[in-house]
């Protein structure tokens, strides 16, 4: 059975997709058969691999909203690298909550829609990575009901600290529905060497300590370099061979994070 991991925060722009695709890249490079499921209507997982999500007709939305589509779930799975597949999201996911909540007869178990998809494919993979939208609605509930581990990206700023607290609270509430759910790590992202950032990092570390939640030693620095290379080469940095001396430290951060999580040795 696959280990199912979500990168989740109700704040946007904190590198959820970058973490998702690069952690998946590390796992794939270590011969771990991995699937990325995109649950965000922006479709950034697909674009990370040079694909236009609007060119893909059969997506996670179809698998979530049409039980018959699960019979051909393999048609929604796209191979993007050795040991690495993805299921794409696009703008259709923007209508997911409205479509489901306005049709309760068709979706009586509306918290279980993603879990149903995961159960269909989990025997084929060692890891399933889920990229999430910056919201705490029905999509987040489906994600929390389907995963074991949640990794929370934390940008050390005022609004992000508030978001961290609320995300942890939402996960704690959902433990009744999913006893296997846990916050596996909080990962600092977009970190700069300023007193303000260090103050918010210290505050976040102190808060997570009170919640018995790990706070990562791996910091994702505030830089555009690896984002630019991903965009130029249409592949996450952890899947790029022969990176430059400038980019090698960023690749190593993701490698160390996956080791810290205990997913590889």
Show where each model-derived region lies.
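P-loop NTP-binding core
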Residues: 1-265
